[in-house]
Amino acid sequence: MKYIYLLILFVIGCSSTDNLENNFGIVIHGGAGTILKENMTLELEEKYKNALKEAVVIGYEILNDGGTSQKAVEKTINYLEDSPLFNAGKGAVLNFDGEVELDASFMEGKNLNAGAISGSKKIKNPISTAIKVMNSSSHVMLSGKGADDFAVEHNMETVEQNYFKTERRINSLEKIKNIENNKVSNLSNSDYRVQKLGTVGCVALDKFGNLSAGTSTGGMTNKKWNRIGDAPIIGAGTYANNKSCAVSSTGWGEYFIRGVVAYDIAALMEYKNLSIRKAAKTVIEKISKMGGDGGVI
């Protein structure tokens, strides 16, 4: 595959007494796509690796100190949202109108509680607001102005659009518009497809045996009509159940929605007793046959 996958950093910890009840683990991804391997300089690649390492350390330390998987997932993703390198929060891709629209979702496996937001134009850390929706409302998913209003009412940090925008994303929008307008003839299909991918995510297991999963994204470059991908959709982009697994997806959202990717993996584990590796492989192969691509943790 031509794309570079900013996957995966995995850490698992055990107590010195090897008590399985004290095991914990965390896995993160920085998205599939958004940058082609041949366009990645060594310097930029090192920046990505360092940012991912720093992010996973945040979650690891929380879990190691006995913190919850919810907190570990939230704070790890917060770090990635605050970095201009990733397609989430600051540095997210731009839509057709040159604006950022942000999506995020969170789910905890112990009780199947979940929260999500989509189409936000000013929430600094969408994953935190998704968790706030879960904990402080009777709803699961809020969108657009409603999500932004909810964030303000609950004292979540909001910022102006210029905070999110970077020169790299502005240039990417111009490039993809040229492709779609047939003004540039020397760009490959992969140049076009790579603009459709990109997300950050984290799954974690805490010492209490509880799983959590979270996903945050700016979606696809040049998206129109308030398009929403899989990232904020529970069961497609994010899923967690203590009976099976925790999943965060990254890839071509339309296919991941149609394939109900995150839940499908958990269902294969719970109802067909497949291993997590076999279940994930089966579902990703299904998506590939449909014409999509991407990955999961």
Outline where the language-model segments fall.
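Alpha/propeptide regions of enzymes that mature by internal proteolysis
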Residues: 18-297
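Sec-dependent signal peptide recognition
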Residues: 1-7
